[in-house]
Amino acid sequence: MQENTRLRIAIQKSGRLSKESIELLSECGVKMHIHEQSLIAFSTNLPIDILRVRDDDIPGLIFDGVVDLGIIGENVLEENELERQSLGENPSYKLLKKLDFGYCRLSLALPQEKKFQNLKDFEGLRIATSYPQLLKRFMKENGINYKNCMLTGSVEVAPRANLADAICDLVSSGATLQANNLKEVKVIYESRACLIQKENALSKEKQTLVDKIMLRVAGVMQARESKYIMLHAPKEKLDKIQALLPGVERPTILPLAHDEKNVALHMVSKENLFWETMEALKEEGASSILVLPIEKMLK
């Protein structure tokens, strides 16, 4: 098959989105062999090439039409879009789907000993960040004047090194901030991974493949957030038992062999079934309660 007929997907080579991007593609049926030092992987069962690059490069590859699809954090995508716009360009792309991983937030943080009342406390401060465009937009919207200190890494050490008075950096758990004697005071941007497509139209063959992948991505995400529940229930308690089950679609009710008083319920729940709910089900007479993960799902 000619190279230009193969779908090109850019993902992060290393970092917080890399592993989960590969897992998502694998769960969508894309078979590939990833070698640690290799920058490109070829699918063995679909006409797909996986480009493993720096996350900062993925938006540009999409904007310029070099690759067809990309998995990228919204924070990196928007930072790069704002950067291009600041240069007078008009970058474009198609947002196909927000994904269920890579959650983080871009936040302002101060040294623990500094008091914080409101955003005016940042007036005139020197703020270290790797996201100058997102910070600039937020501060402009809130009428705050500040001094920018651009760093490409280790932003959290800037106050301790007297490079800045505060920072604007990504936060997941907050452990890194705490380890550097910093406190998160204001979230300025919420982010997660997303799947994007270049703006230019794809060939019919590529678009058909993208549509197939999107159907599978939706199925994988639905399966991840769903559980398959099986239990036995007294016929006389069916209404009460169904009312206890969170996010359940219409259940399948099956007769039990040699048992006239009970039935089997099979159902898909879009919410986790906690121990408290299982105990409440048991109190209403349910038994043999099984909660199972779902590997794949298509509606």
UniProtKB/Swiss-Prot annotation:
Feedback inhibited by histidine. Its EC number is 2.4.2.17. Its main location: cytoplasm. InterPro entries: ATP-PRT_HisG_long, ATP_PRibTrfase_cat, ATP_PRibTrfase_CS, ATP_PRibTrfase_HisG, HisG_C, N-reg_PII-like_a/b, N-reg_PII/ATP_PRibTrfase_C. Pfam families: HisG (PF01634), HisG_C (PF08029). GO terms for biological process: L-histidine biosynthetic process. PROSITE patterns: ATP_P_PHORIBOSYLTR. Its cofactor is Mg(2+). It is found in: Cytoplasm. It comes from the Bacteria. It catalyses: 1-(5-phospho-beta-D-ribosyl)-ATP + diphosphate = 5-phospho-alpha-D-ribose 1-diphosphate + ATP. GO terms for cellular component: cytoplasm. Gene3D superfamilies: 3.30.70.120, Periplasmic binding protein-like II. Keywords: Amino-acid biosynthesis, ATP-binding, Cytoplasm, Glycosyltransferase, Histidine biosynthesis, Magnesium, Metal-binding, Nucleotide-binding, Transferase. Pathway: Amino-acid biosynthesis; L-histidine biosynthesis; L-histidine from 5-phospho-alpha-D-ribose 1-diphosphate: step 1/9. It is an enzyme of class 2 (transferase). The keyword Lipid metabolism does not apply. GO terms for molecular function: ATP binding; ATP phosphoribosyltransferase activity; magnesium ion binding. HAMAP family: HisG_Long. Belongs to the ATP phosphoribosyltransferase family. Long subfamily. Catalyzes the condensation of ATP and 5-phosphoribose 1-diphosphate to form N'-(5'-phosphoribosyl)-ATP (PR-ATP). Has a crucial role in the pathway because the rate of histidine biosynthesis seems to be controlled primarily by regulation of HisG enzymatic activity. PANTHER family: ATP PHOSPHORIBOSYLTRANSFERASE, ATP PHOSPHORIBOSYLTRANSFERASE ATP-PRTASE. This is ATP phosphoribosyltransferase. It comes from Campylobacter jejuni subsp. jejuni serotype O:23/36 (strain 81-176). The gene is hisG.
